[in-house]
């Protein structure tokens, strides 16, 4: 029902989720003999960056916030990013925003709940069961981002990985942009 409301333009439907990316190469769809250990020599210690993001159901636009840790502060920073894009703006009609999130610990902490409550006038949250990726549309996009844009690469540091994450999200958004001539209409 929410998807139909979003497609009709009554609401903005966002699917949210968090994931992590590593500075060392992630091997996606690599071939090896059965039982072989797939390891790629990489310099230094592997570092992680948390990717917190939302996917707009209608426009298929991916919004990503990279954070050094997967904590409530990163989720709140992502909410602030959503404020700028979807929050109420003076002089413009506001559409209600529905955010679909799982019940992960960073989404349900006291800080996160307080941040969500402060946005309750324009943002409502629908909670999925814990660790249930199937109903969340962002899971496939996140998998695509990691497997096709971030895999098989070694990043010098977390700054380079952060830049690569945002470039990959921009590339995905360009791929998913609707083509203006895709739905031709006959003018009357």
PLM regions with names:
Residues 110-114:
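Distinct, well-ordered alpha-helical segments
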Residues 1-81:
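Extended, low-complexity cationic-aromatic segments
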Residues 10-11, 138-188:
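C-terminal anion-handling pockets and recognition modules
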Residues 16-17, 79, 91-108, 131, ...:
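Acidic/histidine-rich, metal-coordinating catalytic segments
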Residues 37-44, 117-138:
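RNase H-like polynucleotidyl transferase catalytic core
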Residues 14, 81-92, 166:
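Structured catalytic cores of enzymes that bind and process phosphorylated ligands/cofactors
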Residues 12, 96-97, 124:
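The start of beta-strands in P-loop NTPase/AAA+ ATPase cores
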């Amino acid at each position: 029902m929410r998807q139909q409301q979003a497609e009709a333009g009554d609401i903005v439907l966002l699917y949210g989720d968090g994931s992590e990316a590593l500075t060392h190469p992630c091997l996606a769809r690599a071939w090896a003999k059965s039982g072989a250990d797939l390891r790629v020599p990489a310099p230094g210690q592997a570092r992680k960056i948390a990717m917190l993001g939302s996917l707009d159901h209608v426009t298929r636009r991916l919004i990503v916030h990279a954070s050094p840790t997967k904590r409530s502060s990163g989720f709140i920073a992502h909410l602030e990013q959503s404020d700028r894009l979807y929050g109420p703006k003076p002089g413009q009609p506001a559409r209600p925003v529905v955010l679909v999130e799982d019940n992960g610990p960073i989404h349900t902490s006291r800080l996160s709940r307080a941040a969500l409550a402060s946005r309750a006038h324009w943002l409502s949250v629908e909670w999925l069961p814990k660790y249930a990726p199937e109903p969340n549309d962002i899971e496939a996009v996140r998998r695509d981002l990691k497997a096709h844009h971030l895999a098989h690469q070694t990043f010098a540091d977390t700054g380079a990985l952060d830049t690569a994450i945002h470039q990959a999200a921009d590339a995905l958004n360009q791929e998913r942009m609707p083509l203006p001539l895709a739905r031709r209409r006959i003018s009357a």
